[in-house]
Each structure stands twice: as C-alpha cells, then as structure tokens.
C-alpha cells in the first residue's frame, strides 16, 4: 500500500520517479543560476535585501492592489516609489529562494540520506518538505502568476528570449527609485 490510497503501487512509484526527476531539474536550475550567473544572482539578492522606508510603506496599502483590482479602500491611495522590486516582491522572492533551497536540501536528504536520518528526523523533514511545497505552490498559483499577468509588459519580459528587458516607460511606472538610481537610458539615434 501507499499513502495515496486509491492509486496502484506502480502509479505511486512512477509519480515518485517523476518527482525525483523534477527535483533534479529544480536543483540544476537553482544551482545553475548561482554558479553560472553569480553576478546576476548577487544583484538580485542585493535588490531583495535593500529595505528602506518606502519598502515598508508599500505594505500600508499593498501597492494599491486591493483598491485597484477589488475596489477595497485599503490604506492610503498613494503608493510610495519603489526600487527594482516592491515590498511584496521582496518578501515573496526571499521566501521563494529560502523555500526552494530548503526543498532542495530536504528532498535530497529524504531521497539519498533516508537510511541515515532516523525515523524522527525523516518524519519532520518529510512533513516540512510537503508543507513547504504546498506553501510555495499556493504563493505561485494565487499571487505570483496572477500579479504577473496584471502587468503584461513584465509578463512579456519573463517569456522573451534574451535578457528579459522591459520598456523604460514600464520601469518608470513600476520601479521609479530603481530607474533613477541604477538604470541608464540609452537613446537610439
């Protein structure tokens, strides 16, 4: 028997094989980003770790999203200017990075190190691995993807082959502090 109840052992085993292959792919993706684009990763982390007054003030009205999309008059109307990432992005991306690192470590420990862990440690790693994956999946499904779709310019930047640039105008609207401090406008003649 398996923990999923209604499926056959063969199906459960096949799902576990797929799980391990996808885990290996996620591991290669994350580790590859750090190893093959360390400067890009460092810049991303620098931008995520810079919390100023405006970052904190973003949470007073959650960037105006409740007012704009749900007509809920939450907090002040004014959204303070943000850097490369707004307060919500900084918080969620830091959670994503920590959770992905945790899921990678616990996943490999559960798969390769199971005989060495002992029942209690295995149990708690398993529980936190499962719940961590549920939390990350919920964040991606309920917040990250819907909010990315609200900004088509950013959404197109994600899927564009190459650097994933966005227009100067989109950056000016969403990230004015970052634009003023870090971005050089190139004017083509």
Language-model features, listed with the residues they occupy:
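Membrane-embedded alpha-helical bundles that constitute the cytochrome b-like, heme-associated redox core
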Residues: 1-189
């Amino acid at each position: 028997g398996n923990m999923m109840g209604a499926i056959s052992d063969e199906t459960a085993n096949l799902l576990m094989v797929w799980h391990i292959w996808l885990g290996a792919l996620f591991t290669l993706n994350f580790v590859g980003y750090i190893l093959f684009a360390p400067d890009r990763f460092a810049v991303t982390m620098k931008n995520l770790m810079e919390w100023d007054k405006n970052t904190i003030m973003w949470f007073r009205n959650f960037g105006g999203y409740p007012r704009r999309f749900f007509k809920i008059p939450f907090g002040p109307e004014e959204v303070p200017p943000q850097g490369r990432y707004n307060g919500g992005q900084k918080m969620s991306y830091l959670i994503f990075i920590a959770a992905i690192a945790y899921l990678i470590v616990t996943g490999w420990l559960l798969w390769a190190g199971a005989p060495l862990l002992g029942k209690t440690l295995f149990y708690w790693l398993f529980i936190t691995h499962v719940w961590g994956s549920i939390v990350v999946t919920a964040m991606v499904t309920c917040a990250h993807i819907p909010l990315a779709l609200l900004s088509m310019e950013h959404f197109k930047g994600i899927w564009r082959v190459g650097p994933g640039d966005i227009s100067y105008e989109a950056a000016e609207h969403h990230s004015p502090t970052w634009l003023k401090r870090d971005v050089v406008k190139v004017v083509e003649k």
